[in-house]
Amino acid sequence: MSEKLQKVLARAGHGSRREIESLIKSGRVSVNGVVAKLGERLEDESSVVRIDGHIVSAKVQEEVICRVLAYYKPEGELCTRHDPEGRRTVFDRLPKIRGSRWISVGRLDANTSGLLLFTTDGELANRLMHPSRQVEREYLVRVFGEVTEQKVRNLVKGVELEDGLARFEDVVYAGGEGMNHTFYVVINEGRNREVRRLWESQECTVSRLKRVRYGDIFLDKKLPRGGWMELDLKEVNYLRELVELRPEKETMLDLSKDNTSRKRERARSQKIRRAVKRHEERVSTSKGRSNNPARRKPKKNAGEQGARNKHR
């Protein structure tokens, strides 16, 4: 099987297909030492592909299994592969894989926690992030300020931000007292700090923000902060169908619904928790307490699921 070079590189996470096409047109991509041409096809993984002289991963479709992780990002972690100041990044705790790499589906601010998806398929990541797909993202947000019915109507109708009109698809009150209020809000694009800026437009300050859903993938209440779990084939194909990609036939998971599998999954969850704890202890030892963000025990979020179900 052969595939177009730009498609292979986009799936490997080196940019969107249009960005890769631009790189090829600029002569910045080579295959086996020869400058690549737009539309060139790769036959197998034996070809050596370089971008700006650096060897990059490039596998044709038959050699790639699309994998997706759901990660519970804690506050304080950065959505970058490498930080020059040595701060924690969301990639630090992810499992190592050979012949591929994890690609984040969008980003979350350092001060935002919650669900962050990772995949080995760059094309899937790019499509899920693209505004034209209008994939819903749901957040649990705590705001400080006076929240009136008119302000909520403004947020649903749409307000003009510096980068254009923005709005919430849904706003549901989830409790609060005094000037502190908690809401579930839904957006269908991923502009920078969009949730925070929308509330700021109504003279309200976001004091806590947590993503709880991406499409129909929810943050699992059993997942600890800093923990991850791999999605099964059904969930992976739900995401692929959502953005019009052909379904996968294989998965790296082999979990049925029997009791043995459930026990195995519980043991896996406990293993993740222990790994997270060991990681935090290593970071604390190497950097000292002064460089560590404050840590809190994860709260049980069964109530969040119930509150969401009420307005879906």
Curated annotation (Swiss-Prot):
S4 RNA-binding domain sequence ranges: 3-74
User: What Enzyme Commission number(s) does the record list for this chain?
Assistant: 5.4.99.22
UniProt keywords (A-Z) are: Isomerase, RNA-binding, rRNA processing
Name the residues annotated as catalytic in the UniProt entry: D109
UniProt GO BP? enzyme-directed rRNA pseudouridine synthesis
Instruction: Provide a Gene Ontology MF annotation, just one.
Output: 23S rRNA pseudouridine(2605) synthase activity
Q: So what does this one do?
A: Responsible for synthesis of pseudouridine from uracil-2605 in 23S ribosomal RNA.
Q: Describe the family membership recorded for this protein in Swiss-Prot or TrEMBL.
A: Belongs to the pseudouridine synthase RsuA family.
User: Does this UniProt record's set of keywords contain Phosphoprotein?
Assistant: no
Record keyword Isomerase present: yes
**Catalytic activity entry:** uridine(2605) in 23S rRNA = pseudouridine(2605) in 23S rRNA
**Domain of life here?**
Bacteria
Name the NCBIfam families on file.
PRK10700.1, pseudouridine synthase
Where does the record place the region Disordered?
A: 254-312
Composition-biased stretches, type Basic residues, lie in 263-277
Q: Which gene encodes it?
A: rluB
Native species = Vibrio parahaemolyticus serotype O3:K6 (strain RIMD 2210633)
Designated name of the protein:
Ribosomal large subunit pseudouridine synthase B
